[in-house]
């Protein structure tokens, strides 16, 4: 969990410090106040481009120095539970008209205690420099590292209004969603996915060159794709199996049970390497690689109604997606010993009162949950303490 969050020149926040407790963190304020911007900042403490998938240059505050910083202190959730914090009312300052140059990213010292288990407070930070606005910097305990290293210390899952149509969106969006779920259970997944994509881009460029491509170089790239692609496929399928089993075993409740399956390419290292070697001419003509795990789709069904999620009503699709995320959060906590941080943007506003109350009951005592809404009344059903933050007031 995050025990401290500092934003410097991030979106509309010039200089913002929050001290959230464990459990519920409720952000309320008018539209445009910067609630989702805070969630986006938290989401950058995970590998990837954050919950908006925006370019880094877009995140720096307009009128600022052209850079931004997001810093946080991570604390073991198990040590904070029942410690008496919470019920803390923090007033987030309104965006400033001007601000000094952003502070440098923290340079805290100390040794990391253990991979994947936070034994003591850990300082993490990410951001950019004005001289390189599209180059992301990541630091853990003051040491510069890669974004993929963040997953060893913190798992973050999110739901946003933009994901409401996930089941009818292009397959690539569902693959991206599945990859985030997989990464939480298999930290090496990000490495394999990045290496696979890099090798595939290099192969595509080589096939597009005029003249006869270098066969040995093609074979070397295809061997890399086969090695990392098979690992990507295996991790995804393991996640689908584990999560699908958990969903199927759940009792009927306010969130319908979802069935999960993968459709498309499947195979091991040998199968993928053979497929790639045999499809060079076809891929060259198409201008892209047509076989491999990048062509897989996540198929979701409404189990209780035995029909595709894409055919469900808008309300049912939202409830199915929320049920998947909740089940996955339980699975992560069970298998890693640390509950994930959940970011739920405007989720409460789209649920009826009974489902909203059921959501709060389900999430109580299960880690840190950040939620946004325009009205305080949306969160009246929270039973217990919460950090309530008024944004932009």
Regions found by a protein language model. Name each.
Residues 345-347:
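Walker B catalytic acidic pair
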Residues 46-78, 85-100, 112-173, 177-189, ...:
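Nucleotide-state sensing region of NTPase/ATPase domains
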Residues 163-249, 254:
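An accessory alpha-helical subdomain
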Residues 35:
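Conserved lysine of the Walker
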